[in-house]
Amino acid sequence: MNTDITLQDAEGCGFDPQGSQTLTQRYIEPKVVKLNMEYCDKNLLGTWAQYQVKIAAGKEVLPFEEQFIGDVIAHVNDAVEKTVWQGKKATAGEFDGILEVLKGASKTATKDETSNWKTLQNVYFALPQVAKKEDTAIFVSPEFYEAWIQEMIEKNMFHIFPNDAANSVKLPGTSVDVIKVNGLTGSNKIVAGRKSNVYIGVDMSNDKETFDFWYSKDDRVFRLAIEFSFGVQVAFPDQMVVCSLV
């Protein structure tokens, strides 16, 4: 929504409509993706999990099932996060991520060859004023974030880091958070803008709607199926900033 208002003198009577509101629309193009995995409990024989393997019929329980499934879900979450930022719909199992959506449509900032701090300042100053709100953030990869932290420590700016384990910190002199996101790992990109400018679309009540784990008597194996639809979109790409680090 683009809103333009005009304040008028109200000394007299009457009604003089001025200003406008324009509704813009950008479509989310979700992609249906899935994960299918299969487990044969006999393959666990000879491993640390073998003592829980029950071969007898009617004992269809996968040893350490909770740990197996929990690890799969963690990896699915990591893969989705990376795709949210770096995905390309031309790649199987991926949808266009934020970087792809912003390609050629966002503002750009220049990397400073001598200082990560100066690079972040360049990103901040490249933001249009309309994008500098309470929910504005600068998103960086873990490798950039950690290098910036070390640079600040070398400058004896310990006071800006309230918690050594924090994943975000205010950019000095601004109200903008610098946030470390794993989804940007290896991208050599920095993204800045309002959080409310980015939208994620899923198919039903959550982002992993179909989740089935069962024992197949036909093949005598355990099977896992996860299927969901996911997509991202940016309402106003020209209010975002992308900085390339290479």
List each language-model region with its residue ranges.
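Ordered core of a single globular domain
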Residues: 118-155
